[in-house]
Amino acid sequence: MANYIEVFSVLAIIFATVLAALAQDCSPEGAQCVRDSECCYNECIDSLCQP
């Protein structure tokens, strides 16, 4: 029984990691931002992604 719990834990960690990677997608021009790194190829100026 313990093996099933272990396998499930590993799968849950992998699933969470994949979701986190997808969630870190960049924001397009005009999107709200806090840091330059949030914008795809733009800068964060006045809380908006600018080219």
From Swiss-Prot:
Tissue-level expression reads: Expressed by the venom gland. Is the most highly expressed peptide and is around 3000 times higher expressed in the thoracic glands compared to its body tissues.
Which cystines does this chain contain? 26-40, 33-44, 39-49
Q: Name one GO cellular component term.
A: extracellular region
The entry's family comment says: Belongs to the asilidin-1 family.
Key words of the record: Calcium channel impairing toxin, Disulfide bond, Ion channel impairing toxin, Knottin, Neurotoxin, Secreted, Signal, Toxin, Voltage-gated calcium channel impairing toxin
Q: Could you tell me which species this protein originates from?
A: Machimus arthriticus
Query: What role does this protein play?
Result: Induces neurotoxic effect on honeybees, including slow movements, disorientation and paralysis. Since it provokes similar symptoms than omega-atracotoxin, it is probable that it acts in the same way by inhibiting voltage-gated calcium channels.
Q: Does the keyword Cytoplasm apply?
A: no
Q: For this UniProt entry, what is the primary localization, expressed as one broad class?
A: secreted
- Report the subcellular localization: Secreted
Q: Which GO terms describe its molecular function?
A: calcium channel regulator activity; toxin activity
Signal peptide positions on this chain: 1-23
Question: What is the name attached to this protein's record?
Answer: U-Asilidin(1)-Mar1a
Query: What does the record's free text say on domains?
Result: The presence of a 'disulfide through disulfide knot' structurally defines this protein as a knottin.
